[in-house]
């Protein structure tokens, strides 16, 4: 059983650094926008002690752990749907993911360019989600024409799906993300094949500096991000991508010592 997660965010927020930490890869993570162009894919086994305990009882020929496949795509910018930056065509690479990891820059660093010119995690989240929503609107618009044609021909399934689209599409055009639109579980199931990006479970990953990660209390800016996540109904975590990447490259004994030092 495997889970697939797509990593999104603005350029220079640490997506590739975090991808490297998660997958123990060594893809370039440079200080310039669009360092990542082609998608990077890494598969990670999920440790589970219960699996080892069960194997000890039944002694199977092979043990197959659960996996997570991470897909790191190029950074999106404001106006990507209109061709800004590298555009949004590479969003097709995460269309079939089960969840979205939205990496948000939450650290100050003069030597690392911020494409928006200043640090504002909530603004950056809204920028990315707007671009994802515009992509979803285009997907629904394309599907709508076919549904209407099939419904006129008496296709019952098309009629059912069309009823849901008639609820969802106007709200999307008002700027409402799909997962924020009130639908029954059956209605949401009908539009699942569309693989809409703003309908997927989303985790905000606040990429912070070492001082922030060592602090028990969140900074004012970081707290705003967590409050925003709660309003959205999404989860949020903080981590230091740079530190995690360093830890992932250590030998097991060194890693234990390092983690103890950083508590």
Question: Whereabouts are the PLM-identified features?
Answer:
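Conserved G1/Walker A P-loop phosphate-binding module
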Residues: 1-113, 142, 147
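Signal for well-folded cores of large energy- and translation-related assemblies
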Residues: 23, 27, 55, 59, ...
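Glycine-rich loops and low-complexity Gly/Arg-rich segments
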Residues: 68-70, 94-97, 125-129, 228-232, ...
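C-terminal-of-GTPase-core extension/linker across diverse P-loop GTPases
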Residues: 2-8, 13, 19, 146-263
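Short amphipathic alpha-helical segments with heptad-repeat character
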Residues: 91, 134-137, 237, 263
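Conserved Switch II/interswitch segment of TRAFAC-class P-loop GTPases
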Residues: 42-47, 74-84, 95-156, 171-184, ...
């Amino acid at each position: 059983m495997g889970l697939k997660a797509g990593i999104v965010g603005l350029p220079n927020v640490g997506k590739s650094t975090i991808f490297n930490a998660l997958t123990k890869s060594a893809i370039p993570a440079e200080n310039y926008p669009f360092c990542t162009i082609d998608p990077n894919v890494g598969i990670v086994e999920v440790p589970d002690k219960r699996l080892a305990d069960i194997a000890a009882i039944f002694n199977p020929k092979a043990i197959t752990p659960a996996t997570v496949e991470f897909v790191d795509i190029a950074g999106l910018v404001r106006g990507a749907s209109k061709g800004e930056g590298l555009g949004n065509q590479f969003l097709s690479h995460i269309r079939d993911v089960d969840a979205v990891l939205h990496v948000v820059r939450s650290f100050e660093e003069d030597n690392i360019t911020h494409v928006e010119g200043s640090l504002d995690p909530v603004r950056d989240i809204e920028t990315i989600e707007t671009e994802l929503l515009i992509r979803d609107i285009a997907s629904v618009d394309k599907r709508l024409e076919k549904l209407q044609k099939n419904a006129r021909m008496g296709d019952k399934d098309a009629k059912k799906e069309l009823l849901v689209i008639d609820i969802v599409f106007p709200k999307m055009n008002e700027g409402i993300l799909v997962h924020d639109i009130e639908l029954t579980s059956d209605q949401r199931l009908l539009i699942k094949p569309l693989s809409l990006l703003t309908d997927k479970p989303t985790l905000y990953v606040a990429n912070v500096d070492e001082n922030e990660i060592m602090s028990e209390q969140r900074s004012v800016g970081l707290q705003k991000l967590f409050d925003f996540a709660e309003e959205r109904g999404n989860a949020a975590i903080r981590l230091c991508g740079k530190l995690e990447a360093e830890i992932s490259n250590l030998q097991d004994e060194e890693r234990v010592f390092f983690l103890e030092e950083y508590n």
